[in-house]
Amino acid sequence: MPVPQTPARMPRKLLRDQIFDTLLDAIVSGDLVAGEPISDKQLETWLGASRTPIREAVNRLAGMGLIEVLPQRGTRIAPLDPIRFAEEMEMLGVVYSAAVREAVALLTDADRARIAELHATVSRTREALERARIVDALMSVFIDRYRNTLIQRIRERSVPHVTRMITARPGALDATDTSAALDALASAAAAGDADAAAHAVSAYFTAGVASVMARDAAETAAMTVTEDESA
C-alpha cells in the first residue's frame, strides 16, 4: 500500500522499555525490596501488561544483576551486596575521573551553569535517594559532554546498584563525608582545572565507599554482639 500521508502516532517507548523503566525505578527506590519474590502474574496485574514484555524486561534486569531468576524457585529482587557496591563505586571512580579530566576542557557555559546549579541543590539535600540522583545528574554533565558510549553503558549498568544501596541504608553514605569532594568538583569545573576535577571525582567515590562500608561493618558488629548476648 502507499505510504500514508497523515503522521503516524508512534509510541515514545516500546512497552517492554516502559516496563523496564518502571521496574528499575521500583528496585532502585526500594519499593521492591531486596530479596522480595516476584511472579509474572503479580507483575501483570500491577503493570497491566502481558507476560511477554514483562519477561523481556525482567530478563534485562536479571542481566544487570538486579533480579535473580532461580531455576525451580522463581524470581526475586536481588539481595543487596556490599562487596558489589564497593566494586561498582571503585570502578566508577576510576572511569569517571578519567572522563572528567577530558571533559572539563569541553564544557560549555551552559554546562558550567548546570554544574553550579546541581551543586547548590545537592548541598542542601539530605534525603538519600534524591541526593544520589542529583549527584548522578551532576556527573552526567561531564559524561554526556565527553560522549563516550562505553562509559555511558558502564554508567547505565553500575549507577542503579550504587543508588540502590545508598537508598536502602539511609545515612550509610554520610553527606558530610562526600560534600568536600563535590565542593572541589564544582570549583574545579568553574575554574577549568581538569586535574583538580578528576581528583575530586576520585575522592568522592573513595569517601563514598569508606562511608558505606564503615556503616555496614558497624551494623554487622552490633548484630554479632546482640547474638552473643542472646546465646
Segments (PLM) and residue ranges:
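A short structural micro-motif
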Residues: 121-122, 141, 161-164, 203-208
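C-terminal regulatory/oligomerization modules of transcriptional regulators
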Residues: 130-140, 144-168, 213-214, 224-231
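C-terminal all-alpha effector/ligand-binding and dimerization domain
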Residues: 167-231
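DNA-binding alpha-helical recognition surfaces that contact promoter or target DNA
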Residues: 56, 153, 199
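Secondary-structure boundary/capping motif
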Residues: 16, 54-58, 119, 145, ...
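All-alpha effector-binding/dimerization core of bacterial HTH-type transcriptional repressors
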Residues: 78-146, 157, 174-200
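Short linear motifs at protein or domain termini
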Residues: 1-105, 213-231
